[in-house]
Amino acid sequence: MSEVSEVRVRFCPSPTGTPHVGMVRTALFNWAYARHTGGKLVFRIEDTDAKRDSEESYQAIIDSLKWLNLGWDEGIEVGGPHEPYRQSQRMDIYADVLEKLKESGDVYPAYSTNEEVQARHKAAGRDPQLGYDNYDRDLTEEQIAQFKAEGREPVWRLRMPDNRIYEWHDLVRGDMSVDGKTVPDFVVARSNGQPLYTLVNPVDDALMEITHVLRGEDLLPSTPRQIALYEALVRVGVAKQVPTFGHLPFVMGEGNKKLSKRDPESNLFNHRDNGIIPEGMLNYLSLLGWSLSADEDIFTMQQLIDNFDVADVKPNPARFDQKKLEAINADHIRMLELGDFTERLRAYLEEYKGFPADYPADKFAFAAELVQTRIKTLSDADGLLRFLITSDADLSLDEKAARKNLKEDAVEVLEVAIAQLEAIADGEFKTDVIEKALQSKLIEEMELKPRKAYGALRVAISGAAVSPPLFESMELLGKESTLARLRAAREQTPFAPAQQ
C-alpha cells in the first residue's frame, strides 16, 4: 500500500456553543503545520449530535476562522475530492465501512447490558465499574438466537487485538505505550446502526488521507483504540496508514483549572468584540504551548509559518493570561501600517461602539494616528476619542479628574487659555499655533509646570485625565467647541468667580 507523502492535517470541530480559544489554538497549530510543511489543511464538521449541534454554532466556527484569516485548502465551503465534509451528510459512507468491518470480523455484535457486565465483574470479585469485559466476543449461535428471541438489538464493538502493547511516537509527548489489556473492546455503532464518533472520526481521517492528527490532550487516552481501528481499516482497504499523532496541551484558566466554556476568556468572540485584532490573538494563542525563541514573544504569522514545528510544542498545560494577550495585542496594533489601522479602527468603532459613520474621514485619520501607540485594544480608543463625538452640552467631566485638576488655581489657567485661544484666527486654529499660544503664556511667562498648566485644560475639553495629545485634540474639536468647553469648565470649578 503506497503512503501519502504530502502532510495532510485536519480541523474537525463539533458545532456546539461559541468558538473556544482552545479549539481555535488547535486550528492554528494545524494551519501553521500545514503551511510550514507545504501540506494541506482539511476543514470538516463533526455534526452527528443532533441534540447539541446547531447551524448557528456551525456558522460561528466558519466566522471565527475567517476573522482570524486562517484559510483551509479543502473542506467546508471550498470543496475538494473527499466531499461531503459534514459528517451528517456521510452516513452512507459509514454504513458501508461498518459492513466491511463486520464481514472481516473486526467488529462483532454485543448484546450484554451494563447491568449484566457489572454483575459478571462482581461475581468474579472485580470492580463493577471496570467497563466492558469482552464477554460477547465468542457467543455461540444458540446464545445469539436466544438474545434475538428476547428482542435484543446488539451494539457493534471493535475486537481489540489480544496481548498487544500499543506503542507510538507522539509528536508532542515523545514515545508512548499502553498495555492493550487495559483497553476493552469498544462500541463503534449503536444498536440502531448509527455510527459513533469512535468510528466516524477515524474513518473520515482514513478516507481523507490525513497523515498527522494534531488534537487536544483530552483525546490522548483514546489513541490505542484508534490505532486498533486504523489497523482494521487498513486490512479492509479503507485506510492507507495509521496517522502520526500529536496531543496538544490543555489551555488552563485561573486556579490551574482547565479553561471551560463558562469562563469569559474562553470565548473567542468576546476577545474580538473587546478589540483584540487577529494578529494579536494568533500571536498569543501560538504561545500557549509554543514559542519562537526564549526571549521573543512578538512575531508575525509569516515568522510562525517559517518556524513552527509540532515537535517544539511543549506538553505542559498552558495558562491563559488576559493581560499578556492585551500586551501582545498592543504591539501588533503599533505594528500596523497607519492606513490599515485607521480603517480597522473605524470599522470596529462603528460596529461595536456606535461611532457615527458621518464623522469626517480626515479628522478620524488624524485622531487614529494620535491613539495608535496609546491603546492595547481597539476598544480602548473609544474611551480616548468619545469626547470628539460628544456635544459640548453633553460632555460630562470625570468626577475624580475634575476634583484633582479643577481646583482654585485652575480658574486662572482656564481664563488665560481662553484669552490666548480667542486671539487665534479661525483659519489658523492648528496644533502648532495652539501649542505656541498656550506655552508662551502658561509655561514661559507664568512659569507653570506642564502638568499644572495643561491638566485642567485636558479635563475641560475631554472630560477625562487621559486623552490624546492636548493641542491636537483642540485642533480636532475646533476653536468653537474648545472655547465652549473651557468656559464651561471655568464655570464648574468650585472657585470660579460669581457671575455678575
Curated annotation (Swiss-Prot):
Q: EC number(s) in its UniProt entry?
A: 6.1.1.17
Question: Which transformation does this protein catalyse, written as a reaction?
Answer: tRNA(Glu) + L-glutamate + ATP = L-glutamyl-tRNA(Glu) + AMP + diphosphate
What family is it from?
Belongs to the class-I aminoacyl-tRNA synthetase family. Glutamate--tRNA ligase type 1 subfamily.
| CDD domains in alphabetical order | GluRS_core
* Record text on subunit structure and interactions: Monomer.
List the molecular function annotations (GO) for this entry. Answer: ATP binding; glutamate-tRNA ligase activity; tRNA binding; zinc ion binding
Q: What is this protein called?
A: Glutamate--tRNA ligase
Location in the cell reads: Cytoplasm
Query: Looking at the record's lineage, which domain of life comes first?
Result: Bacteria
Pinpoint motif 'HIGH' region by residue range.
13-23
Question: The motif 'KMSKS' region: which residues?
Answer: 258-262
Principal location listed in the UniProt entry: cytoplasm
Pfam hit, one:
tRNA-synt_1c
Record function comment: Catalyzes the attachment of glutamate to tRNA(Glu) in a two-step reaction: glutamate is first activated by ATP to form Glu-AMP and then transferred to the acceptor end of tRNA(Glu).
Membrane-spanning intervals of the chain: none
Which UniProt keywords are listed? Aminoacyl-tRNA synthetase, ATP-binding, Cytoplasm, Ligase, Nucleotide-binding, Protein biosynthesis
Family annotation (InterPro entries):
aa-tRNA-synth_I_cd-bd (IPR045462), aa-tRNA-synth_I_codon-bd_sub2 (IPR020751), aa_tRNA-synth_I_cd-bd_sf (IPR008925), Glu-tRNA-ligase_bac/mito (IPR004527), Glu-tRNA-synth_I_codon-bd_sub1 (IPR020752), Glu/Gln-tRNA-synth (IPR000924), Glu/Gln-tRNA-synth_Ib_cat-dom (IPR020058), GluQ/Sye (IPR049940)
A GO cellular component term found in this entry reads: cytosol
- Residue sites binding ATP per the record: K261
Tell me a GO biological process for this protein: glutamyl-tRNA aminoacylation
